[in-house]
Amino acid sequence: SVDAGVTPLAATSSDVAVAVPEPMPGGDEQVEYTSVQKYNLRVFDAAGNEKLCIDLSSLTEDSDYFYVSAFAVDGQGNTVLMTGGNALTILDAQGNVTGSIDLSTEQTGVGNIIALADGSVAALVYSEDYSSFDLCPVDMTGMKLGESIASLPTDAYSAAPSGGGYDLCYNKGESFYGYTMATDTEEKLVTWINCDVNSSNVSSASITESGDIVCLSSEYSNTGEGATTYLITLKKTPYDQVPQKTTLTLACVYLNYDVKNMVLDFNRKSSDYRIEVRDYSEFNTDDDYTAGLTKLITEIGSGAVPDLLITDNLPMDTFGAKGLFEDLWPYIEADEEIGGRAGVVEPFFNAISQDGKLYEVTSGFAVRTIAGPASIIGTEPGWTYDDMFAALDQMPEGCELFGLGTTRNDVFTSICTMNLSKFVDWNTGECSFDSEEFISLMEFANRFPETFDWENHEWTPEDNDSTRIKEGRQLLVMLSLSDPYSYTYYSEMFNGEMALKGYPGVPGSGAVFYSNGTGLAISSTCANKDAAWSFVRTLLTRDYQENYGYGFVTNRELFDENIKNMVGQSYYTYDESTGEEKEIKFTQENADTIMELIENTTMVADYNSSQINDIINEEVAYYFSGEKSAQDVAATIQNRVSIYVNEQR
């Protein structure tokens, strides 16, 4: 047990070595202390007995900040230390320094050093385009890096020497791989979470000669009580010797920490069901970081739908129109613990529903809107693009509508995203891009500059939104509200006289929702829907949202409680132009404004219709360049998007 903390760890067939920063004693408050850092290299045998303790202080004498970023031990007991990321230091088996290698000549940089199965040590040197690693042996005689002997994927950054017939092993996404240099092939051995292991907690994973997988797992407590570290051994076991459970598949593109813990908890507690994760991020390549997402969307579109789905970045409007996923409203209504519709923030879930059907749930949300000074724009939500410029006419000469550097593409993209669900009805396949409203949006955006010369602009604190608004140089701000603090932050910009006016053409409050947490959905073809719901409902529980909720939570009881508890609380902010601290209190009036905003918001922003956005941006460029009229561009967009939408339904 080492309280000071262990940095890198390396091993030979008989010994284990660790680099440990040595803690300095505390003491009397009357005494002035100077910070001192000291590293020891400690070598232990298989029984845990210390064989060697080497003081590395001599290596720190010429460095203001010394640290060991990686090290490896070769078959003869020589240790290679990577210090500060720019040098390798070689020590013999007795701990004597025998030489060093300057890494600053490696222009692309060295990512790591690793011991190989043949007992040698090699450096992982980034390739010229950073798409792979060149595996370069460490020449301990010539004190240099040798020529590359293999090209490894960037996932091999944390590679370790391997037994079981593999040269190296490493993590890749949620899975663990063995790599064979002779054939330049990798083999997926396990998906950690499907073995009830949290990959986020795994370190020092390796493969034994018998093929077992051994790793350390540090599990952290939410109560701040520190971590407990376990030594885990995974053994190949015949399928018929494993307790049998019904499997539910969960597909995702990256598995975040919160849902990972949900899956582990579900699998440990359920005696009848087990969730198996398929993380499509493993199909991403260095050339295409969206390959996994594309593959998942294609498979779902062709009918290969998983039982459960993490909906982040996926076109749920398209999937919903095809009836691929279960309506979750009946499950919420029948769930007595959640409390039915009254137990969730219903306006948000109504907004993300399609034709009254709720295809996904999430733990948090936020609201986007446009705000300005109440004395100029009025307090009632709703206005037109012409109203915006009419309000601007009341401001001093030189005042701008939005923040410094706002271009027409900024304005068009932002407002179009907020309004996209108005122009596309996935349930009927009807589109309305040839409407006066969409044409007005293009014409409004075209009144802004094409570009802003940031390269030649020297930014100062006076350029921030807060200072510009207070000095009458900026009228409005597009903002996101995700908690009471964000409201008071923006309200202070307008000296407490902020009006939430909303986006032109957006009904109700003029604001739009967007999801601020992971979404989950259940396939309409899932054979065990009740079991799937017992997992999905976790997102909506008070316990989950107290621990993992972010922004405005969707559990109604907790949401109301959070708002109520913030009334009277003080926030402190700094005036960026003066540096003065200012206290701001969250009032009951502020709370009422937030509640009214949420209760009257009916639309949701669409960030996931990338194909539609590509069509729109391609065509609107012809209008912005003056090549086509707004009407002609709108007609083309209407035609192209209508065809696309109906092909996808």
Residue ranges and their predicted role:
Residues 314-369, 386-387, 497-504:
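Hinge/lid segment of periplasmic solute-binding proteins
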Residues 428-462, 489, 498-503:
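Glycine-centered hinge/linker elements that transmit conformational signals in sensory
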Residues 329-343, 421-443, 502-512, 626:
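Short, solvent-exposed loop/beta-turn-alpha elements that line the ligand-binding surface or hinge
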Residues 357-368, 387-446, 472-476:
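Extracytoplasmic/periplasmic solute-binding protein
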Residues 491-561:
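Extracytoplasmic/periplasmic substrate-recognition and gating elements
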Residues 276-343, 466-476, 492-493:
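Extracytoplasmic "Venus flytrap"/periplasmic binding protein-like
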Residues 514, 573-645:
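C-terminal capping/gating helix-and-loop segments adjacent to ligand/active sites or protein-protein/ligand interfaces
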